Amino acid sequence: MQQQLDALQLEALKAIREAADLTILERIRVDFLGKKGKLSALLGGMARLPAEERPVVGALVNQVKARVEEALAAQQTHLQDQLIELRLVAEALDVTMPGRFVPPGRLHPLTATTDRIVDVFVGLGFTVASGPQIETEYYNFEALNTPADHPARDMQDTFYLSDGLVLRTQTSSVQIRYMEENDPPVRICVPGRVYRRDQVTNRHSPVFHQLELLAVDEEITFGDLKGTLTFFTQEMFGDRPVRFRPSFFPFTEPSAEVDVQCRFCDGKGCRTCSHTGWLEIAGCGMVDPNVFQAVGYNPEKVQGFAAGMGIERIAMLLYDINDIRLFYTNDLRFLRQF
């Protein structure tokens, strides 16, 4: 029996050393150590041995099994290392080769302008807010001191939907929603898309972008409004002349419009500025007491100012663009300039 075990061990170790891959090695393991393997067959003959020899033979079998298993593990590690080396060679990267060119993305000029405007007002302590683009007539008109029979509704050709809904004509509607849910003091800026039934021209579009500004606190004055917007125009346009001219909005009183000198003609008058020398960028004013009452604020205790500015107009001034329609054409020749 011992001679048979020694011969089996030598045969197994030789086969293991010569195994060229893991598949052959696994086949050798099953052939020698499997349930129907050669070692199991020898163990089956132990029943015919005298009782006093069985412990000795059992110990020899365990030694052979341990040596074969040790050789199998060592050869498996060796073959796995070889596979890793071959894979590393096959997948080696030439670090001197040029990489794939991925064209860098760019911000659309309207997005870049919006981000720049928001950065200015966030730096002044304002928080960014947002609201739905499909609005109720209440939030778009009534709560902003524009009842159904108010003549100011004729000033805005609105996209009316069903069930008393509209495409919002201004981001001012977010003022109401925010004040309903938050007590003063309030300082928010609201960038967003708005809709009006305007004719498409070089200065007007039925879909455009606004940024709304609202500040509510005790003892806020028109001087605070003027100072805030003057600082904003200086941050955006430098020392270019700015003017505030009286205007009318149903939700502010007094009201004004903010114009920046046209940079295409330096105030001399051109087609872009309708030969006025100025480009309107914002409407503003002190919040009407009726608006405060609509949201449950006491107009005797708080005051506030609001402003709404056209992002397209500001982008036109920043980038010397004389036609608003260029923003919406998706012309890469235009967009790649920014």
Curated annotation (Swiss-Prot):
It is an enzyme of class 6 (ligase). It is found in: Cytoplasm. One of its GO terms (cellular component) is cytoplasm. It holds the Pfam family tRNA-synt_2d. The lineage of its organism: Bacteria, Bacillati, Cyanobacteriota, Cyanophyceae, Gloeobacterales. CDD domains: PheRS_alpha_core. Binds 2 magnesium ions per tetramer. Its cofactor is Mg(2+). It catalyses: tRNA(Phe) + L-phenylalanine + ATP = L-phenylalanyl-tRNA(Phe) + AMP + diphosphate + H(+). One of its GO terms (biological process) is phenylalanyl-tRNA aminoacylation. Keywords: Aminoacyl-tRNA synthetase, ATP-binding, Cytoplasm, Ligase, Magnesium, Metal-binding, Nucleotide-binding, Protein biosynthesis. InterPro entries: aa-tRNA-synth_II (IPR006195), aa-tRNA-synth_II/BPL/LPL (IPR045864), Phe-tRNA-synth_IIc_asu (IPR004529), Phe-tRNA_ligase_II_N (IPR004188), Phe_tRNA_ligase_alpha1_bac (IPR022911), Phenylalanyl-tRNA_Synthase (IPR002319), tRNA-bd_arm (IPR010978). Mg(2+) binds at residue 253. The gene is pheS. Tetramer of two alpha and two beta subunits. This is Phenylalanine--tRNA ligase alpha subunit. HAMAP family: Phe_tRNA_synth_alpha1. Its EC number is 6.1.1.20. The keyword Plastid does not apply.
